[in-house]
Amino acid sequence: KCKCVCEGFAKAFKFLCDKIDLECWVVSGKGSSSIGAGPHAWNIVKINGYYHHVDVTWDNQYSDSSSMPNYGYMNLSDDEIAKDHTWNKKHYPECPSSPYNYFRVNNALLDSKAQLESMLYNSLQMEEEFITFRVVRGSILEREINGCLTDCIQKAANRCKYISVPTFRYGGVPEQLTFFVQPDYCYR
């Protein structure tokens, strides 16, 4: 039936990393989120000398459709993943920073409404099927995001010359301050 739980995801990810000689650990710990809490397994990978946490299970379960990508748990630091994961740190490499975090690498780590509107506008102009971003913890945008996301999407869409976005879906992973937008495009 090809089904597994978190340990299977983590071991499969390690298997793939081993095939390309990417140092990878399977981490055993606990996870706690709005979905539930309990024993959990995920990975630590070493990329260009930096260790990062990767949780392919939670990136998969937070995606509400098989085609909706989620990168909320891709290449996190200890502090970032500790928002909803716990583990015995003495058994694993330290992950003090996350230079290869998906959102950092893709310039989708935002701390202001102006940055959000600009990123949304550029993404809509390019007719991206999915738009993903992370809000910087402690930023003004963190306090405003729940009240302004719909408005920012609509403002960005209204600036587009040749397309309109009459409907869209959005959601995210609140613990990791990651969000996605899936626009439905129409042409003017």
Say what each PLM segment does.
Residues 7-79:
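Hydrophobic/aromatic-rich core segments of domains that either
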